[in-house]
């Protein structure tokens, strides 16, 4: 169906139930304005439901419609405020699924509010009965809207200047085990990892303030470790102090204490909510702190291919919200991450302008209006033996976090950190010399290991570790398998 079937005039406002496509929510001749917010949904209608009607219903229920005609529509600029589904395409190789392109007038959204944006776009509509499933695949955010957000508080360029580290990925590690350590032992892990050559250590998502270690105790021991490691190495170091708590008041208190102790970075979890994230981002900018976001909980709605919200959308929202770091996948690690899809995530974080790239799952051109760049973080099941693959897939503007790959080293934590640092330095040197480091990677690492016993032990310990599983979320226009490690 390529023509409009909208009912016009008085008949449009007769009491009763009317199909969404006849109420003005299906407008195939509509040309989106530069100022429109555009959303791409993957729509899976119930059996027997017209895909055009299902898509129009998504447009209606995410903007101005309800289940019946209401006369109060005539008191508004209804033609302007209705979301308009203007294109519906079958999803390649996915029978019964459709891509619905929906345009929203900018006036429907509050400036600078992810909470308001998400309340409309992913509000009630995801529970709509005529749909088997619904997924928000991508969004085009107009420049006029983007400029109402502050963007990353620090950004990649200023972070590198603050850390005095250039020309290579940054190295980190999540403290393990994530729960159960005392404050003193936790601080010892931080010191060993930083002294061994890492740039950062990190709290995990669920370490907050528990009986075995109060948050204040952790902060004190961690910052003591950071200061000692800086003195020993002559390098600037940091540890992501997780300020996530039950209330905003508690989070502000913890962030202020981290600042008083001299930390360069704090951390929050995605589960605190969009408004809390934006609030902490504003605090971080005001107080010159780097803000790390752990994407805890995201896979509950980003992983399934037919229902939920794509992580590329979450990445866009978080760049608007103003965090400086976000976990964005590893390609070769233990967590979900198709190579092409992950490339799309990284481009969203790091580029000033994103062209449409269907092969990476990016459906719209996106102008970031000079917002700072967001540093992606790769963590989860990576080790020194993958350094050539990580550098090739992810580039240099990334934090590579080797948690188990540092703390699980057979010679100890400091040796694990040294192994990762030497592997990275060897690979960067090979890259700068113009070598084909991706294909020569194993040879480069083996040569470096001849003069670095910790690296030799790491390569031997994890040489057979693979996470070769097919990804559940891949670009529909360029299906690719997960990378074999």
From Swiss-Prot:
<feature type="binding site">
    <location>
        <position position="327"/>
    </location>
    <ligand>
        <name>substrate</name>
    </ligand>
</feature>
<dbReference type="GO" id="GO:0004497">
    <property type="term" value="F:monooxygenase activity"/>
</dbReference>
<keyword id="KW-0113">Calvin cycle</keyword>
<dbReference type="GO" id="GO:0016984">
    <property type="term" value="F:ribulose-bisphosphate carboxylase activity"/>
</dbReference>
<dbReference type="InterPro" id="IPR020878">
    <property type="entry name" value="RuBisCo_large_chain_AS"/>
</dbReference>
<dbReference type="Pfam" id="PF02788">
    <property type="entry name" value="RuBisCO_large_N"/>
</dbReference>
<keyword id="KW-0479">Metal-binding</keyword>
<comment type="function">
    <text>RuBisCO catalyzes two reactions: the carboxylation of D-ribulose 1,5-bisphosphate, the primary event in carbon dioxide fixation, as well as the oxidative fragmentation of the pentose substrate. Both reactions occur simultaneously and in competition at the same active site.</text>
</comment>
<comment type="similarity">
    <text>Belongs to the RuBisCO large chain family. Type I subfamily.</text>
</comment>
<dbReference type="InterPro" id="IPR033966">
    <property type="entry name" value="RuBisCO"/>
</dbReference>
<feature type="binding site">
    <location>
        <position position="174"/>
    </location>
    <ligand>
        <name>substrate</name>
    </ligand>
</feature>
<keyword id="KW-0503">Monooxygenase</keyword>
<feature type="active site" description="Proton acceptor">
    <location>
        <position position="176"/>
    </location>
</feature>
<dbReference type="Pfam" id="PF00016">
    <property type="entry name" value="RuBisCO_large"/>
</dbReference>
<feature type="binding site">
    <location>
        <position position="178"/>
    </location>
    <ligand>
        <name>substrate</name>
    </ligand>
</feature>
<keyword id="KW-0460">Magnesium</keyword>
<dbReference type="GO" id="GO:0000287">
    <property type="term" value="F:magnesium ion binding"/>
</dbReference>
<keyword id="KW-0560">Oxidoreductase</keyword>
<dbReference type="InterPro" id="IPR020888">
    <property type="entry name" value="RuBisCO_lsuI"/>
</dbReference>
<feature type="binding site">
    <location>
        <position position="379"/>
    </location>
    <ligand>
        <name>substrate</name>
    </ligand>
</feature>
<protein>
    <recommendedName>
        <fullName>Ribulose bisphosphate carboxylase large chain</fullName>
        <ecNumber>4.1.1.39</ecNumber>
    </recommendedName>
</protein>
<feature type="binding site">
    <location>
        <position position="205"/>
    </location>
    <ligand>
        <name>Mg(2+)</name>
    </ligand>
</feature>
<feature type="binding site">
    <location>
        <position position="295"/>
    </location>
    <ligand>
        <name>substrate</name>
    </ligand>
</feature>
<keyword id="KW-0456">Lyase</keyword>
<dbReference type="InterPro" id="IPR017443">
    <property type="entry name" value="RuBisCO_lsu_fd_N"/>
</dbReference>
<keyword id="KW-0602">Photosynthesis</keyword>
<dbReference type="GO" id="GO:0019253">
    <property type="term" value="P:reductive pentose-phosphate cycle"/>
</dbReference>
<keyword id="KW-0120">Carbon dioxide fixation</keyword>
<feature type="site" description="Transition state stabilizer">
    <location>
        <position position="334"/>
    </location>
</feature>
<feature type="binding site" description="in homodimeric partner">
    <location>
        <position position="124"/>
    </location>
    <ligand>
        <name>substrate</name>
    </ligand>
</feature>
<feature type="binding site">
    <location>
        <position position="204"/>
    </location>
    <ligand>
        <name>Mg(2+)</name>
    </ligand>
</feature>
<feature type="binding site" description="via carbamate group">
    <location>
        <position position="202"/>
    </location>
    <ligand>
        <name>Mg(2+)</name>
    </ligand>
</feature>
<comment type="subunit">
    <text>Heterohexadecamer of 8 large chains and 8 small chains.</text>
</comment>
<dbReference type="InterPro" id="IPR000685">
    <property type="entry name" value="RuBisCO_lsu_C"/>
</dbReference>
<dbReference type="InterPro" id="IPR036422">
    <property type="entry name" value="RuBisCO_lsu_N_sf"/>
</dbReference>
<dbReference type="InterPro" id="IPR036376">
    <property type="entry name" value="RuBisCO_lsu_C_sf"/>
</dbReference>
<feature type="active site" description="Proton acceptor">
    <location>
        <position position="294"/>
    </location>
</feature>
<feature type="modified residue" description="N6-carboxylysine">
    <location>
        <position position="202"/>
    </location>
</feature>
